[in-house]
């Protein structure tokens, strides 16, 4: 039962043990792992592919991924925030809508809120994986993981606090 109840530490230990035993000419797939730092750790240990509901489920629950951590759009501080979810994000949502408007839609239970937040989170994950590929190509994946740890561990993200 990998990724079904074990701690992140146990999962990382299992992945670290198993991936060297898998064939190098076959893709290595880890199901159900979707937190950014967990993905980065798994990639660092040789995993190639993932699938997980986290980007879409979290979007439906008002949790938005950014390069600075998680934004919880339902928090009152976003009532009047006219900025996009992430300033330099090029997704459709960030180019066209403010946090306050998305929060308003979410609080009104408008289905458009879930759609806009999902668009953003899926785009974030595409960019996140692109950054991982660049970090691998530039031989600085370890440094990139340290940056991610500074972001997500400081927010308590790896312990399910999102």
Q: Over which residues does each language-model region extend?
A:
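Glycine-rich phosphate/ribose-binding loops and adjacent secondary-structure elements
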Residues: 1-85
């Amino acid at each position: 039962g990998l990724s079904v109840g074990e701690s992140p530490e146990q999962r990382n230990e299992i992945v670290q043990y198993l991936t060297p035993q898998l064939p190098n000419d076959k893709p290595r797939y880890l199901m159900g792992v979707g937190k950014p730092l967990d993905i980065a750790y798994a990639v660092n240990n040789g995993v190639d592919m993932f699938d997980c509901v986290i980007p879409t489920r979290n979007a439906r629950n008002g949790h938005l991924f950014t390069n600075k951590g998680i934004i919880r759009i339902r928090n009152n501080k976003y009532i009047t925030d006219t900025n996009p979810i992430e300033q330099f994000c090029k997704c459709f949502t960030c180019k066209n809508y403010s946090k306050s408007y998305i929060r308003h839609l979410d609080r009104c239970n408008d289905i458009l809120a879930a759609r806009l937040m999902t668009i953003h989170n899926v785009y974030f994950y595409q960019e996140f994986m692109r950054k991982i590929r660049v970090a691998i190509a530039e031989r600085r994946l370890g440094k990139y993981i340290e940056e991610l740890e500074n972001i997500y561990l400081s927010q308590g993200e790896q312990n399910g606090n999102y």
